[in-house]
Amino acid sequence: MEADFVILSLTPILIGCFAAMACALPGNFLMLRRQAMLGDAISHVVLPGIVVAFLFTGSASTWAMMLGAGAAAMVSVLLIEGIRRLAGVEPGAAMGVTFTTMFALGVLLLEGSGAGAVHLDVEHALYGNLESLIWLDATGWESLVDPVALAGLPPELGRMAAVFALIAIAGFIFWRPLVLATFDEGFARTLGLPVQAISLGLVAAAAMACVAAFTAVGSIL
């Protein structure tokens, strides 16, 4: 029973926990800034970028997905700003139009490009593939100290743990300016804090967490 838990359940639980914590750290600040919808937007707009990156490189590597997601995020920012100015609508409405359009485009690309027949498909892109991230080389708890067994861990575990650690360390280092810029932007500006750079860094952290968690929990979750 213990061996079955280590093989089948331990790594999916750990990956899910790291994904939840990595997304929650920037997500809480986005909520406090009344930008909770931005988290939804980021997780949706990265989908077409990830699909296009996969089609160009033929690889589902982290760096290719990061570049594709970053490009999609920049396009989305331009679209949101363009819609807001040209149509004269509120930023929230422009954001809603943009992220639903980008998400639909990503699903269409998945269905029409043939990527689903290789490594990407709609179901896994939307809901992830957490149940398949098992540790086949494990024999029990003793495998946690076995270098050979540890080499067979799903790469998503190390990737998600590294992203969580990076975001947590950055949050610890920049905690004071981040809190000041979140709760009193005017006061933060008078102190000479780079408020705009802090906001961009927060969005970048959220995007990084979304891309890292994409394989495990998908675009929606």
Annotate each language-model stretch with its function.
Residues M1-A22:
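Membrane-interfacial amphipathic/re-entrant helices at transmembrane-helix boundaries
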Residues F103-A170:
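Transmembrane helix-bundle core of multi-pass membrane transporters
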Residues I13-F18, M66-A71, A93-V97, L157-A162, ...:
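Hydrophobic alpha-helical transmembrane segments
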Residues L8-P12, S61-M65, I167, C210:
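Short alpha-helical transmembrane interface motifs in multi-pass membrane proteins
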Residues C17, M21-L25, A71-L78, L105, ...:
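Generic alpha-helical transmembrane segments of integral inner-membrane proteins
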Residues A151-L221:
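Helix-loop-helix "hairpin" substructures at the membrane interface of multi-pass membrane proteins
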Residues L79, V97, V122, F183, ...:
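General structural feature for long, well-ordered alpha-helical segments within catalytic domains
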Residues N28-S43, L47-L120:
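Short loop segments and helix-boundary regions at transmembrane helix junctions
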